[in-house]
């Protein structure tokens, strides 16, 4: 069964998209590889039926985004949901200053998640506590920001580019390209347009907050488009309306792991959960005649099955 990258529209939760896929595909076995906030759009990777076994191997995939960071105002959710809770007058930073601040966030770091997030502490969801007027002490999480590229600075959100085309560098402002739908702005704030490549677990809302703090002003994420998840680009994604007939991608295309071809006895042993002897070291995808057999971990002596797939 396929892996289907979907272009999530503005306003839907990731669970909304999963439910629509279940109805469209006629199956309850649908999962996704990483939540996208309701006010964000872009790539949400769905795994259908037997492909749901892949989710655990895809959740750590790196992601790319276009992010609009509004300077001079913030909100409890750190995005355009509002309401504004702090507003200060601010002028746009220079390109030199903005680039220097962004460069300071590239690399491994500890990031504090937003209060409005699904993180659990002591059995409590952070967003549930926040909606009730409270706040949890959220521990910082280790993340990696691979790259942050400043694509533009605007005096206000309405002047920031919204039309983009894919290039060799990623999605780039292009008046002949595709126009993205973004949330209504909370105000007329100077806005940074940033292209970001980050590890799994990175909150772009937290990044917006922290970039603002580095510039000495409150800030929030005014818009977000996820343009890539692992191997899947926004250009490869289907609309929610086209889920029923979407062909998607085969399971093998989803796994960015070294591959090893098995003969029939080895394939059978792995599918039975056995631990055959092997000099292979590290995690590998095992195939047989182009079919996915298993994901295994090798210690140089034997193979341990992490996940196996039944033969055709």
Curated annotation (Swiss-Prot):
It comes from Deinococcus geothermalis (strain DSM 11300 / CIP 105573 / AG-3a). GO terms for molecular function: RNA binding; tRNA pseudouridine(55) synthase activity. Belongs to the pseudouridine synthase TruB family. Type 1 subfamily. The gene is truB. It catalyses: uridine(55) in tRNA = pseudouridine(55) in tRNA. Keywords: Isomerase, tRNA processing. InterPro entries: PsdUridine_synth_cat_dom_sf (IPR020103), PsdUridine_synth_N (IPR002501), tRNA_psdUridine_synth_TruB (IPR014780), TruB_C (IPR032819). This is tRNA pseudouridine synthase B. It comes from the Bacteria. The active site is at residue 37.
């Amino acid at each position: 069964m396929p892996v289907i990258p979907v272009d999530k529209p503005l306003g839907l939760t990731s669970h909304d998209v999963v439910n629509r896929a279940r109805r469209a595909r006629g199956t309850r076995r649908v999962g996704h590889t990483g939540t996208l906030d309701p006010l964000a759009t872009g790539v949400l990777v769905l795994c259908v039926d037997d492909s749901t076994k892949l989710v655990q191997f895809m959740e750590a995939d790196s992601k790319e985004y276009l992010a609009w960071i509004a300077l001079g105002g913030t909100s409890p959710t750190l995005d355009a949901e509002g309401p504004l809770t702090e507003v200060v007058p601010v002028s746009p930073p220079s390109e030199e200053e903005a680039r220097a601040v962004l460069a300071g966030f590239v690399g491994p770091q500890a990031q504090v998640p937003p209060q409005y997030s699904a993180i659990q502490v002591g059995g409590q969801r952070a967003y549930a506590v926040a909606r009730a007027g409270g706040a949890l002490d959220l521990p910082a999480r280790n993340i990696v920001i691979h790259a942050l590229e400043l694509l533009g600075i605007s005096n206000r959100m309405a002047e920031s580019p919204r039309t983009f085309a894919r290039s060799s560098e990623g999605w780039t402002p292009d008046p002949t390209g595709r126009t993205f739908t973004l949330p209504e702005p909370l105000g007329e704030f100077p806005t940074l347009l940033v292209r970001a490549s980050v590890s799994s677990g990175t909150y772009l809302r937290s990044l917006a907050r922290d970039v603002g703090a580095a510039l000495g002003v409150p800030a929030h994420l005014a818009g977000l488009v996820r343009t890539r998840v692992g191997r899947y680009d926004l250009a490869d994604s289907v609309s929610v309306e086209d889920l029923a007939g979407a062909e998607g991608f085969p399971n093998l295309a989803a796994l960015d792991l070294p591959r090893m071809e098995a003969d029939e006895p080895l394939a059978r042993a792995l599918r039975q959960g056995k631990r055959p002897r092997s000099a292979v070291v590290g995690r590998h995808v095992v195939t047989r005649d182009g079919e996915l057999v298993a994901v295994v971990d090798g210690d140089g002596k034997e193979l341990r099955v992490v996940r196996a797939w039944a033969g055709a």
